[in-house]
Amino acid sequence: MTPTARLLAATLLAALAATSPAQSRKDSVVLGMVLEPAPGLDPTMASAAAIGEVVHLSVLEGLTKIAMDGTVSPLLAESWSVDPDGRVYSFKLKRGVKFHDGEAFDAGDVKFSFERAKAEGSTNKAKKSVFDNISRIETPDPHTVILVLERADGNFLFRMGEATAAILDPKSAAGTATKPIGTGPFRFEDWKKGASITLTKNPDYRNAAAVKMKKVTWRFISDPAAQVSALLAGDIDGMPRFGAPQNLPQFQADKRFTVAIGGTEGKTIVAINNKRKPFDDVRVRRAIAAAVDRKAIVDGALEGYGAPIGSHLVP
C-alpha cells in the first residue's frame, strides 16, 4: 500500500472567507489567520503553509508566479526558454530589481538560493522533488541563469512559482526566519508573537504605483467563535479559512459582508504506521477504510463544506 493510500478519513476542507464592513479603510487591511507561522518566516526552510501565506508574493518573490487558474507567468524572471529535451531552462532576469535592504538582485542570488535549497542538511520541503533534480546552475552574466536538470520535469516552471523557490539575498538569508528580506511589494515590519504580523508597503518596489495598500496586518485567531466576533465587530477585514461554517448563513444574510467559498489543499486525515501491528495487515487497513463514513464527517463537522477523498492524494 502506498503512503497516499493511507488517507482513510480524509476530507478536503473548503476555504471559507468572510469580509467585513471595516474595508472602508482603503490603504490598510487587517486579515484574520487561523495558525501563526511556525517555526519562523522562511518558506524555503520550513514546511508550514502559514509561512507562505504571509510572506510569499508579498515580501518574497520567485522567478515565476502562479495565477489563480494555474497558469505560470514571469515574476523575477523576464522571460525564459527551454531546450527540446526539457532539461535546460534559460532565464533572463528583470533588471533594476532591489531587495528591501537596497542590495541589487542578480543571477548570483538565484544561484545562491537554489544551492542553499539543495545543500546537504537543507530542510526545504521541495529539496528532493525539485532542487535535487538541478544538476548544474550557470550564471553567464548578472541577468542570466541557466538551470540544467537531471531529468525533464513538466512542472518545473510551476514549481519555480512556489514559496519553496523564493529568492533570497545571501547577505540576509540567515535571518529570514525572523526578519525576511525580499524583493516584493511589501516589507516585513513587525511580528508580535502570539498576536500579529505587520507588513508595510515597499516604496521602492518596481511597480509601486500598483500597490494600493500601505499596511497589511495578519491577526492570529484560532478560535472560530473569536473569528465570528472579530468580523462582526469590524476588528478584521477578512477571515480566510473561516472556521465556523455553521455561521455562514448569518454572514450571507448580512449585506455588509461578502462570503467567498472555494477549495484549499487542507486535509483531515487518519495517519497509520503500516509497519506496526495490526496495521501491517492490509485487511485491517481496508476494514478501517470501510468503517469510516467520510461523508458523515464532512456533513457533521464541516456543515457539508468539504469533499471526501476517494482516491490517492498527497499527504
What does each model-identified segment do?
Residues 9-16:
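Bacterial N-terminal signal peptides
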Residues 23-24, 92, 126-169, 190:
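Surface-exposed binding/hinge segments that line
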Residues 32-84, 115, 181-183:
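N-terminal lobe/hinge region of extracytoplasmic solute-binding protein
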Residues 132, 217-229, 242-246:
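Short helix-initiation/N-cap motifs at beta->coil->alpha
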Residues 158-217, 223:
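Gly/Pro-rich hinge or "lid" segments in bacterial periplasmic/extracellular proteins
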Residues 208-210, 238-315:
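Local pocket/hinge segments that shape ligand/substrate recognition
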